[in-house]
Amino acid sequence: MVKGRQGERVRLYVRGTILGYKRSKSNQYPNTSLVQVEGVNTTEEVSWYKGKRMAYIYKAKTKKNGSHYRCIWGKVTRPHGNSGVVRAKFTSNLPPKSMGSRVRVFMYPSNI
């Protein structure tokens, strides 16, 4: 039996930043969030992330299932603008305290 890890590390996710809810001048739509993915700057680069899963991980005061950490899952739906921002729908709407915090954008499911 071999101890330790052999070969290269596999990258499972990239980091993203939650910018806010999708909105117009006077209305906001909390069922869709805007996320800036690190290293993505154009609409063409966003197309690879379409359909990918993302997770907002946060820490709660009370334990559930033996852990203080909880997760809200989401999915990249489409690009937003020309600067590499994506629109994402989450299973439940993100809380307002999540604005500006990190999200994990996973490299699966693959559509290659």
From Swiss-Prot:
One of its GO terms (molecular function) is structural constituent of ribosome. It comes from the Eukaryota. The keyword Ion transport does not apply. One of its GO terms (cellular component) is cytosolic large ribosomal subunit. It holds the Pfam family Ribosomal_L35Ae. Keywords: Ribonucleoprotein, Ribosomal protein. SUPFAM superfamilies: Translation proteins (SSF50447). The keyword Ribosomal protein applies. InterPro entries: Ribosomal_eL33 (IPR001780), Ribosomal_eL33_CS (IPR018266), Ribosomal_eL33_sf (IPR038661), Transl_B-barrel_sf (IPR009000). One of its GO terms (biological process) is translation. Transmembrane segments: none annotated. Belongs to the eukaryotic ribosomal protein eL33 family. This is Large ribosomal subunit protein eL33w. The gene is RPL35AA.
